[in-house]
Amino acid sequence: MKQPKIPVKMLTTLTILMVFLCVGSYLLSPKWQAVRAEYQRQRDPLHQFASQQTPEAQLQALQDKIRANPQNSEQWALLGEYYLWQNDYSNSLLAYRQALQLRGENAELYAALATVLYYQASQHMTAQTRAMIDKALALDSNEITALMLLASDAFMQANYAQAIELWQKVMDLNSPRVNRTQLVESINMAKLLQRRLD
């Protein structure tokens, strides 16, 4: 007995159908979706700066460090700085005050508190802000942040001579915390505006 021959066309169609079914089921599987997501992530030119750099991740990391060691004033200060950059002045003040309570009298922390208060008051020098600056400068007459805040406020009030004097003092300190190029530009701008007033 001869077995019936399956036509070649039918065999080809069945083979193609099988291939499509296999590929289709693979493409619908979760494994393929994970591979595809990873491929797209790798193609993103910013993939190296992924989620660990997001503000939420930074905040979570800082909070985890503080939970692990709540007596670390440095981490509290970093938390204050984080909130300042997020324009969350209330939480920034709380964090900086906690850092100050843990560390004790500290010029940098008083200057940081002054900065938060200054921006919270829409860049106006309040009595409370001035008190924090005075405390910072009493502890360290060369405290960069306090001097820069005074210079910026003088500039905002069109007291260009005072701004130039303070910025020059900061420049003469040769601190690595200072962007000298930006400082020179600020001094030159103040000089230009001063000449216009004269």
Curated annotation (Swiss-Prot):
Keywords: Repeat, TPR repeat
Pfam families: TPR_CcmH_CycH
Superkingdom, taxonomy of origin: Bacteria
Gene3D superfamilies (UniProt xref): Tetratricopeptide repeat domain
InterPro entries the record matches: C-type_cytochrome_biogenesis (IPR051263), TPR-like_helical_dom_sf (IPR011990), TPR_CcmH_CycH (IPR056413), TPR_rpt (IPR019734)
Family annotation (PROSITE patterns): TPR, TPR_REGION
Disruption phenotype: Triple nrfE-nrfF-nrfG deletion mutants no longer attach heme 1 (covalently attached to 'Cys-122', the CWSCK motif) of cytochrome c552 (AC P0ABK9).
First and last residues of every TPR repeat: 73-106, 144-177
Function field: Required for formate-dependent nitrite reduction. Not required for the biosynthesis of any of the c-type cytochromes nor for the secretion of the periplasmic cytochromes.
Protein name: Formate-dependent nitrite reductase complex subunit NrfG
